[in-house]
Amino acid sequence: MSRSSLVDPSFELSDPCPDIHALFIQFDARFFGGSLACCEVKWSPRMYACAGICSYEIRGGRGGLCSIRLSKPLLTLRPRSDLVETLLHEMIHAYLFVKERNRDRDGHGPQFQAHMHRINQAGGTNITIYHSFHDEVRLYKQHWWRCSGPCRDRRPFFGYVKRSCNRAPGPNDRWWSQHQQSCGGNFLKVKEPEGYGQGKGSKRTNDKNKSGGPALKKTITPPRVTLDDFFKKDGKNSSDNSTSKSPTKPSTSLFTGSGQKLGGSSSTSSLLNSYPKATQNSGGNRLGGTSGGVSRLLPPVNFTSPSSAPVAEQVIDLGDSDDDDFQDMDDDALEISFVASDNSVICPSCNTEVMENLIHGHLDYCLG
């Protein structure tokens, strides 16, 4: 085999663990004209049933993401040539997906075989239709179940179900309904990896006990802190210092005048006579008011009393609007009505007749 071959035995020593991304870029430029730049390639650490898989996802009807995944558990046990041929096998599927929209992953028809023979002749490889890693696949299937029904005596499986993960046979399997009709037996687990049922927590505890370390954590209670700890001075509490000293009275008086006796008749009369008396009108007492009922502090305001005749309804006609916001309304004029009340009361301050609905505002204005 020539050195130009992609699977030359010398590469097993010079490059036993190649970078799959570098190989992908090299093979894409050499055999596929760089048309697989939109694809991705990556390792799959939990794929045990097959060596490689190519998936295609359509997004929005304009193409999608093409992904190539290689089984790391299976290919790490195989020679470098198997990795190269498996990668090229999946790249042919990706090329048919991208260029011809052939989404049948298991399709190895004339188109697939044409590209397979072309690459085998150009690169000196031995790409095949199916992978033959049966020994490696069998190695990772450590969880076994066997049926208790009649199918345990039938070829070719004799009732065995072998898997790499701990997932018992059930309704999620495609063949489950057929098995229930033809056999109807129950699956019992007969084999699993050694030490699979042991928990990780007990293992860590045993390791600590063997090494002499503490097996259990001790709870340490922090010391209690009270407010008295923050008021200690020189080893003595502030309460002791405060009790040792007696309170002292002020030596001098704050007020030295003679003062006057509260409630005396002479002082009361003199204080009352020093202020002018407020005038009163016929309508009652009023602070700062005059006999005419007009405040001396505010400008005069005329309040007209309503007539004895009933007040007619006042209508404000806004008319038709030219604005576009009113185009969808009725053709009639938009009207807002205000009805006045004929109830009136007498202001207790200025004896003025004011409408009942305005009395509160009038009192604020009159007494202000």
UniProtKB/Swiss-Prot annotation:
One of its GO terms (molecular function) is polyubiquitin modification-dependent protein binding. Residues 187-309 are annotated as: Disordered. Keywords: Chromosome, DNA damage, DNA repair, Hydrolase, Metal-binding, Metalloprotease, Nucleus, Protease, Zinc, Zinc-finger. Zn(2+) 1 binds at H89, H93, H108. The keyword Cytoplasm does not apply. Residues 21-190 form the SprT-like domain. Pfam families: SprT-like (PF10263), SPRTN_ZBD (PF22934). It is an enzyme of class 3 (hydrolase). Residues 226-237 have a biased composition (Basic and acidic residues). It comes from the Eukaryota. Its EC number is 3.4.24.-. Residues 238-274 have a biased composition (Low complexity). DNA-dependent metalloendopeptidase that mediates the proteolytic cleavage of covalent DNA-protein cross-links (DPCs) during DNA synthesis, thereby playing a key role in maintaining genomic integrity. DPCs are highly toxic DNA lesions that interfere with essential chromatin transactions, such as replication and transcription, and which are induced by reactive agents, such as UV light or formaldehyde. Associates with the DNA replication machinery and specifically removes DPCs during DNA synthesis. This is DNA-dependent metalloprotease dvc-1. It comes from Caenorhabditis elegans. The lineage of its organism: Eukaryota, Metazoa, Ecdysozoa, Nematoda, Chromadorea.
